[in-house]
UniProtKB/Swiss-Prot annotation:
Family to which the UniProt record says this protein belongs: To S.pombe SpAC22F3.04.
Organism whose genome encodes this protein: Schizosaccharomyces pombe (strain 972 / ATCC 24843)
Keywords, in A-Z order: Glycoprotein, Membrane, Transmembrane, Transmembrane helix
Any single GO CC term annotated in Swiss-Prot or TrEMBL for this entry: cell division site
Protein name per the record: Uncharacterized protein C56F8.02
Membrane-crossing residue ranges in chain numbering: 231-251, 397-417, 510-530, 612-632, 720-740, 956-976, 985-1005, 1051-1071, 1114-1134, 1261-1281, 1353-1373, 1408-1428
UniProt main location, coarse: membrane
A biological process from GO: acetyl-CoA biosynthetic process
Top-level taxonomic group: Eukaryota
Source organism phylogeny: Eukaryota, Fungi, Dikarya, Ascomycota, Taphrinomycotina
Pfam families membership: AMP-binding, AMP-dom_DIP2-like, Mug62
SUPFAM superfamilies reported for this sequence: Acetyl-CoA synthetase-like
CDD domains for this protein: Dip2
Subcellular location(s) of the protein: Membrane
Amino acid sequence: MNQFPNQPGNFGQNYYKPVQGSIPANSEATNFQQNNSRENKSECELRQNSIAASMSAYPNGMYAGAENHNVENHENYTMVGHDHMEEVYGDDLVNEPRIAYSSDIVATFDGKDFGSNLHVDDTLDQQWAHFAGKQQHPLEPREIPFPVTDPLNSKIEMKQFTNIAAVLRYRGVHSAKKTAFIILDNKGKEFTSITWEKLASRAEKVAQVIRDKSGLFRSDRVVLMYRDCEAIDFVVSLFGCFIAGVVAVPINRFDDYNELSSILTTTSARLALTTDANLKAFQRDLNAKKLHWPKNVEWWKTNEFGGFHLKKKAEMPPLQVPDLAYIEFSRSPIGELHGVVISHRTILHQMNCLAAIHATAPAYESDKLDYLSIDREYTEGLSKSGLFLTYLDLRQAIGLILGVLHTVFSGYTTVWCPQNAVFVPGLWANLATRYRASFMLTDYAGLKTIAYNYQNDPKATLGFSKKHSVDLSSLRMCMVDCLNVDCEFQEIVSDRWLKPLGNQNPRATFVPLLCLPEHGGMVISMKDWIGGEEFMSPKGFKSPRTPENEISEVLLEKEALKLNEVVVLAEDDKARRQSKHPNTIRVGAFWYPFVDATLAIVDPETQVLCLPNIVGEIWVDSPSLSGGFFALPKQTEAIFHARTSFISSDTFQPIPSNQEFLRTGLLGFIRKGKVYVLGLYEDRLQQKVEWVDNGKQDTIFFHHYTSHLVNTIMRKVSKVFDCSAFDIFVNSEHLPVVLLESPAANIPTEANGNQVVINYGLLDLITTECVECLLEDHQVRVYCVLICAPFTLPRVTKNGRQEIGNMMCRRAFEHGTLPFLYVKFAVERAVLNLPVGEDAIDGIWSSYASGIRQNLLSDQELQYSGFIDRSLRYDAKTSVDISSCHTMLQLLQLRVAKNAEDIAYITIDGRGREGKNITWRKFDQRVATIIRYLQKKKYIKPGRVVVLMYTHSEDFVYALYACFYLGLIPIPVPPLDHMRLSEDVPAFLFLIKHYYVSAVLVNSEADTALRAKTTSQHLKQSAMAAKVVLPSFIVTSKISKQTKSIKELNVKLDPICLDPAFPALVWAFWSPDHRLTLTAYNHQTLLSICQIHKETCQMTHKRPLLGHVRSMSGIGFFHTCLMGVFLGTTTYLLSPVDFANNPLLLFQIISKYKIKDTYATFQTLNYIQNQQPTKWPNLSCLENLMIPHDGRISAFYIASLQKYFVKHGLSPYAFSTVYSNCLNPFISTRSYMGAIPTPQLLDLRALRHGLIQPCESADKPYALPLLDSGMVPVSTQLAIVNPDTRELCRVGEYGEIWMRSSANAISFFQSTDPVDMMRFNATNSDGFLGNGYVRTGDLGFLQITSHSMGPNAPVVDMQLLYVLGPIGETFEVNGLSHFPSDIEDTIERSHPRIARGGTAVFQSAGRVVVVIEALGQDFLAAIVPVVINSILDEHQIIADVVAFTSRGNFPRSRLREKQRGKILASWVTGRLRTTQVFYIRGSGEGEFQSSYVPDYNPSLRSTPSVSSRSTLPQRVF
């Protein structure tokens, strides 16, 4: 547990580098006295050592000569880890600058420091020199100048008791009949009570049973489970554990089973003490929640034990108590559970101090009234030492210390009533009167209820009882447990409640208590009358104590406090009179430190003593403090044994103190020896402030305290029930967040239970008021405000009362788990460090921005690859020179002539059995059959367009070659999907109409699908509506077979088909949005692709090929239709339908037929991975598994695939990604590289500027892991070019990928668009590259890296291609370029309710829009800040609109890819079905609701998504 969050920040004016390494020996350092153990020394020794340490460690005159000091330089520090602090520079801390239009990009990306705009002028030694001799040394502990005696017998000194259990035995004998505890009900009536004799007897009985029957040893832990109303049973068991020598572990929360189990496990407790009623209730709770009883724990009902009866002439068992008394478990501000160990010695130290303070509290004449004047019904039997009245929980913290332990130590009578009793007007004051209370313990929440009830209706208090009038004259101390002193309220309590009700000195009676609830509830400051003030004040000054200065206050300058400086404008009465002045803050003091405590003000970041009048963390050392956390040694060392440092005036170096302190986590200061607390470290907000002075930009941090902000909100904002405020560290900046609880956020319901519309206008008004009031009163630029219903924010238990836990709220806010109904952002004011590009108007590709990059990288080489030409030479199988071949048809005739009986194709069925072998002769005959049939059709002529609609089969290959021979232009397309007819049919009709399709060739399976009733009706109706005449459908598989060969038919290729501009083949590519792209390839290109594929993959005729999925285009097409003919090898065909039924069949075929090179899509591999097949075959033969992709590769996805398949025998070197697109199926590949792909980490911040900069760590939020796409194959050359200026990019920047290759497509089919035509004959601006380049439209870069070519191979340099993504999908904000996929990945990782792949980011009308498919539609407002923060932190942009839609509403392709274009179109046209829309910046301009108002429409329901299993298998993979 570390109570200080790991956030950077500069603490006030003290900016120092923490001490690192060893500290040089120094004469001053040797003067420190070792004080490592607080519990093994006597109180006197501890006090003397503490004083000696203070006097020797801090030179004379250090405090007296101190002046208010301002440090002008500012530097940030952050907490790192739990045990130490260190300085963090660069990316972790500093803010990215605003880059002007003419920003110097060289400075921006210089080394590892990314745009720091915080500079330090002074050297570190000069900073230390400012502190030498000026630091404020710790306040010395005070002595108790008199012996502490028993209030009932002044002859008995309490120091003779060695433990608190011995004191109880003493009370049981000498105050036997006096009442020890009285428990009241909610109406103030006595519920139960117990005398000291019975209390001691029952405790002895519990101890006896534990000793005799439990089997526990000394120091074993025993759990105590009692409810607050069972306080007497709790006290009995607690002291029973003390007497028995075991360690008590109180547990106060029964509703949290996980917390109970954690405590039982941590403490290894085997025994639990409780009551019969409590045990039955606990059993019912477990049964209701279907939980099991904790294991290995025995449960005893102590209310059935009775009392202890000592035999005649027998002596009491000796007390052999261990060091530890009890372990108190509590939660830290961030919700972590930890136990604090309390020893018996610690208890006695604190009891002595508290007894001395109570003994010196002033008593008044009326306090000595004859008890006969009071109703004897209540006063008879009460202790004459004093009566203690409280409603705080007696089982923990200060309630346990004062209400139980100190009651036993001082012999008081404690009267306890439930917290609900304070809500009864007049009851509390009458209880104090009835019992003649000497001391009462309260908290602000209860005391405010009591006091304000009296203010509203005094008669309810004064007339509450007819027996006696209200009189608080006997009250000596009204103790209030609080963290901050409420100056205004303590005036009200003193002057308008205590004084009117008879208290003679109300200001002295009111005693704020500064306690440490996280550390056992120990008191570190409270009002006392012991003396020693002259040692607390500067120069020994002691002001006379009067009733007027019993309440100490100061009026501080608000602006100075923001810089952690204490500038006092007025004190005490003057402060009260001037508190209404603007820009001031009124702060009240607790009092001097606790009598035996050493207290220091320390800079929490540097651990160096602060200067006077500077806010710092309160560190304290005292014998009354706990020894540490239970079973957490590292946290104990960091928190309970912290060491501060002072600056030597000789060496100007930090000298560590040997005295150990407890870090309280409280921020405050000391003035005239009194302790002022501003709040917890976690409750302090900080915000960056920038301004320009004399042309120099300055940056500092203003600090604000949650308590001040909350008070302002509660006073000025209407309809706020409670609130929380904190800051979050996003984008290297602290951003204030406010969470409001408001009754307006309760979801209204009608009488029938139906929910009605929420008044979002009222919620918007409340949040607007909050933003404006904090800006006006505190100059806090709020980042966002969220609203939820009352009692929904996370709370912590303090004194039995639930209070909002700021750090728990922050954690829940960051995780998006709170039930918020509304969120309002004010990013325009709060976010300062949004980066701006070099050219904010024209973007990163402009001449100006490109010129800056060119100047920055002027010493780097240009990015283009080499070119190795590999033209056709000899056919390896036939040893025939094929350099003169111009078409695949010539190679086919070569196979028929030379190897007619060799097998060309074999079909594999679903069981892995071979079908009928197709030899080259039969193949030739089947192609001739289709040629002969088509020649008879008059409308089939060379140059005509035909569509090949086939399932994966050899019929498709026959038809393809028949088209080649006849000079037809084939366009292969898959069959129509009956599940997506609304998408497929329009695309098919578009193809027919715009490209004048003469015929559609199909096989039997495709024909059956077309003739299906649903499909045929849909097709005919759509054709009629679109006025499209359907062409002839020819079923080629049903043509009568004939035995003539192609040669015998005397079929000759038309010469026009050999023209380089003639499209021999047209590939149809559908984007995820189902946008059709047709690319044309001539015969020479097809041969070149085969040649490049053969050379790069080292393919031979000796190994067969396999065609299975995606056979209509790309690599799948070549492996299915062309490579077998080109190599003269056998091609095995596996139907995608059979693969879907048995995914392992693919690898069984590969293993059986020793296939060396094959391909698979990402969908194919993902399908296999999801099916989890067993009995994998041996895959050692597979050397090259090609995975085509047309964009950026997911490094995490590839790693997971690789890990899975390597586990099943596939070589990690076999994974070969292939970069391909519609213009070239084989642009780059990792085939046979002999190296495992290693992600390269790129800096996203540099990437936005167009630069490539490696990132040093994957833990950085801006680190982008990127995999390469391999090397450039033969006969191919790549260049990286600026897409706008057409200048070659240099190494260190990225640009558009241009390619020159014989495998490039010749054109977009029948396109006359000048832009399309320009893409196919691109040249750079200076002509360096020459002509013939094709622009891919993808962004990427080339980089030379060193890799080992396989295991035990030498390291070689490789030029690798990295693909970033399509340039058409990028968008620019402030002149910086962003890839939507990166932002979408960030969003999907940010919250578990965001579906994977369920995010779309795009730019519309200049606004960045985020559309999210959410899981569930409740409390979507809680997710919005998580999304905005994640985008801001990783990408430094702010989304303008966040819209939510139900899961399944995204249009998706048959491959389950989201269709960005359709989502954008539906958003622009208002047809996107959204459940809520949040405007972060700007308004909806009438399209939706007004600015910042969510659009909640519960009537909308998501449509069921189309499962990928329901589509045709060949379209899935």
